[in-house]
Amino acid sequence: MHGWTEIRLSMRELLALALERACYVREPGGQVHGLIYRPFMAWIGAQFGFTCQLIENTPVHASAPAVRPGQALIASVSWEIRDPATHAPRRGGHLVLIHAAHAGTMRFHNPSGYSHNAASATLSLGVFARFHAGRGILVSARA
């Protein structure tokens, strides 16, 4: 999403703003987890001017074609997606950013990926679907 906005904030600043807007759950020990979609969508719409569409109960083969230039899909997947050979992966609990989907191929940023594939991993739609939880957020840049 680099280049979508002129606003530049550090990760620390982004996290503080997201916590102020109840976008995450903060545990008593201070750990942060669990992106809460609706407050997050409202925040990035107001703060950055992005348009968001909630995706729920939708298989990735139906939601991925919506990703076009100027859009990205924040998709809920299992963290095990970094190892596509995982036999029986769980679904959900981790987020990736799909930045391209065409011809049955998904290209995505995976923050928990290995160094060789974290920035831009590629999987077939069928393999990606095994890890996908059927939910996410379609984010569009300002028109």
Please name every model-derived segment.
Residues 1-55:
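Cysteine-nucleophile protease catalytic domains, especially the papain-like/related folds used
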Residues 50, 69-72:
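Loop/turn elements at helix/coil->beta-strand transitions in domains of secreted/extracellular proteins
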Residues 55-61:
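A short, well-structured beta->alpha microelement
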Residues 23, 27-28, 33, 68, ...:
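Noncatalytic regulatory segments and standalone regulatory/sensor domains
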Residues 53-54, 73-76:
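Structural recognition of the beta-strand scaffold that forms the well-ordered cores
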Residues 93:
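Short coil/loop residues immediately preceding or within conserved phosphate-binding loops
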Residues 61-67:
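Surface-exposed ligand/attachment interfaces on beta-rich extracellular proteins
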